[in-house]
Amino acid sequence: MQEAALGMMGATVGGDGDTAVVAEQNRQLKGEIATHPMYEQLLAAHVACLRVATPIDQLPIIEAQLSQSHHLLRSYASTAVGYHHDRHELDNFLAQYVMVLCSFKEQLQQHVRVHAVEAVMACREIENNLHSLTGATLGEGSGATMSEDEDDLPMDFSSDNSGVDFSGGHDMTGFGPLLPTESERSLMERVRQELKLELKQGFKSRIEDVREEIMRKRRAGKLPGDTTTVLKNWWQQHCKWPYPTEDDKAKLVEETGLQLKQINNWFINQRKRNWHNNSHSLTSLKSKRKH
């Protein structure tokens, strides 16, 4: 980054005798960047790129290194005294550089989430296929472990009939490197959690909209308490034949302020709710008449 910045500042010097001058200009420019208001943003963009492909168990290493960075920052800042480039030009450069880093981070995330996961899953498929064909169980970073019945079989693949050694000093049955390491598994788990979070965030608003629509329809389907009181009173008075005529419905519409469709639906639902009770009452009545 410093070399690119020097190029933008026009600080190109030639000749072996100017090496010390170039080195000093580098130090001065580092100092200006270290004391620039965008330094924290620049550092965060770098770290964000680094975190993308770093397994979860190794993230504390980054934090530990960042905790020690203030020593280097203080050293750079001390060299910036009395040396100033065109501030506007440096501002533009750092702003563009941060944008490049943000774009690079997105590309890294795309690579990790698609290509890296596909590669690891392909290795897993190879492992499963090999197990189906040979019964071999592959151990991470080690050779295949065969079943007990096959332990005594000679498996010397160190060279072929041509006398050429293809093993390179390693056991040719060792398919371990094809398997995902603990770091790769950790990375896959991190990608899975990030994708899960993104999906949850992406669908959160949609889920809330659907929930609100359901609640709205429920609220719309419920009739005010005072109106249902009028309908229930009519029902109690006509429980033997709870089928209002058109004139009855028109009167209920006037009294309750409900729509005719709402009243029809209420009586339909009310008859369904009381169907069992009515059937039981009719059966009892018929039974009494027989006796």
Curated annotation (Swiss-Prot):
Give the domain of life.
Eukaryota
Note the SUPFAM superfamilies from the entry: Homeodomain-like
Q: Which GO terms describe its biological process?
A: mucilage biosynthetic process; mucilage extrusion from seed coat; negative regulation of DNA-templated transcription; regulation of secondary cell wall biogenesis; seed coat development; seed growth; xylem development
Q: Which UniProt keywords apply?
A: DNA-binding, Homeobox, Nucleus
| PROSITE patterns assigned | ELK, HOMEOBOX_1, HOMEOBOX_2
Keyword Nuclease set for record: no
Q: Which Pfam families match?
A: Homeobox_KN, KNOX1, KNOX2
Under Gene Ontology molecular function, one entry of this record is:
DNA-binding transcription factor activity
* Keyword DNA-binding included in the entry's annotation: yes
Which InterPro entries would you find in this protein's record? ELK_dom (IPR005539), HD (IPR001356), Homeodomain-like_sf (IPR009057), KN_HD (IPR008422), KNOX1 (IPR005540), KNOX2 (IPR005541), TALE_homeobox (IPR050224)
Q: Which residues bind DNA?
A: 215-278
Q: Which GO terms describe its cellular component?
A: nucleus
ELK domain: residues covered? 194-214
Q: Where in the cell is it found?
A: Nucleus
Task: Give the residue spans that cross the bilayer.
Answer: none
Subunit arrangement? May form heterodimeric complex with the TALE/BELL proteins. Interacts with OFP1, OFP2, OFP3, OFP4 and OFP6.
Q: What PANTHER family does its record include?
A: HOMEOBOX PROTEIN TRANSCRIPTION FACTORS (PTHR11850)
- Known role: May be involved in secondary cell wall biosynthesis.
- According to its UniProt record, which protein family does this protein belong to? Belongs to the TALE/KNOX homeobox family.
Quote the protein name from its UniProt record. Homeobox protein knotted-1-like 7
Q: Which gene encodes it?
A: KNAT7
